[in-house]
């Protein structure tokens, strides 16, 4: 299990950030941050998202966008407005936005090779 401190903020107000501890979960698609912290930072939910739990039940959570910062890396990714009982998770979309991947053996984030497909025109 890897837990790291990551800064979270509103992309529209990047000077205002909060430090939070996150469980790094590369198997989770989205990051989860407590709703009260996101709202305090000025981040507003945009849509509702349904999730299927391992026990077969479904839950619904609000989803918005947040700015994430880890050391010198900054990225914007979708974020789930966590409710009571939800863990702070840093998911795959946020890891990719930060250009990082989880090295589970060393329990740290490593640079993610960034690939860009470019179509070159023939001369």
Model segments located where?
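Pepsin/retropepsin-fold aspartyl endopeptidases
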Residues: 1-123
């Amino acid at each position: 299990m890897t837990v790291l401190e990551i800064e979270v903020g509103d992309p529209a107000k990047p000077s205002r950030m909060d430090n939070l501890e996150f469980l790094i979960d590369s198997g989770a698609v989205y990051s989860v941050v407590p709703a009260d912290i996101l709202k305090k930072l000025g981040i507003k939910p945009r849509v509702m998202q349904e999730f299927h739990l391992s026990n077969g039940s479904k839950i619904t959570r609000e989803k918005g966008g947040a700015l994430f910062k880890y050391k010198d890396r900054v990225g914007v990714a979708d974020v789930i407005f966590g409710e009571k009982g939800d863990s702070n998770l840093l998911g795959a979309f946020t890891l990719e936005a930060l250009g990082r991947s989880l090295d589970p053996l060393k329990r740290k984030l490593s640079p993610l090779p960034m690939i860009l497909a470019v179509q070159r025109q023939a001369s």
